[in-house]
Amino acid sequence: MMSKRRLFRWPAPRTVCLGCLALVFTTLVTMFLYMSEPLDIQPDPEPVNNQIFRQLSEITNTYTNASASEVGLVLAATQKEDLGWLLNYCRDHGTIPFIYTTDTPPAPYLLVPATTRGREATAYLSYIVDFYDQLPKYTIFIHSNVDQWHNDLFGPRTSSVLPHLRLEAVDAQGYVNLRCEHNPGCPTSVNPWEPTQIDIEKDDIRAFFPQVYETLFNVGPEKVPQHIGNVCCGQFAVSRERILQRPRRDYERMLKWAAETELTDSFGVGWVFEKVWHVVFGMEDIYCPRYEQCRCDAYGWCGPLPSGETLQAVRAPRSKGKST
């Protein structure tokens, strides 16, 4: 006999509904249990630059005015800049970094200036105001990049220049530019009372230089010089004694002008200070030491010169020369 064919039957609707509900319930319970478990999520690694900033700030935080370190390095930096060279230098030479952020919002770990207008100019002034009562014996103001075209001796790397700097020259002179080459800046870089017609028509800061000079130095127009000249640019060493020759309120006044002036923009603020740093720190309005003598005083490179002359480096009375 032929067997009967077995017919397929669909499950009853009620059975299907119960099965779906069971599946949904099981899924929800599983998700709840999974989400209740603590997730082993590793935090994102700290950016390399932030790691360097943190390590530099740890060195800064060790500083007191009784610190064994005599030398502070002051600079402005953005979060994108690689300061690995500075970290290595400070560790190798026992110097203290004072790094001011120019970012908005401020970069982590760095010191915050009173204003970011003028970039390194206001970082330098903020440092003096912040640490006026506990300055290291020597302060060297530098730019943040590892290579600087301003460095005219020992190559472009600031880390190659600093070890050769004679701190005895800073003792003797109070202010020492890290650069010796006269061009640009010497013999004259600004003629305050003789702006060009183009400067006047464009409302360039040069057209207002007498007014700016009077404000920065709290003097009358009769004290504004006819000419200003100095070795470029914004890298120099200053002794504690020379910084303290001005009261703190002088530096605060300069900072206030930088933050509030409507005569120029941030770039112009920085430009102004590059023209007058030597005046801020007690040098003549035109300060252009002979190139060979500057090289001898600042770095001990005294000859003999091609002419056969051998120079004598400046010395501070009763002081022992050191290098950074």
Language-model-detected regions and their locations in the chain:
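ER/Golgi luminal nucleotide-sugar-dependent glycosyltransferases, focusing on the catalytic module
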Residues: 2-324
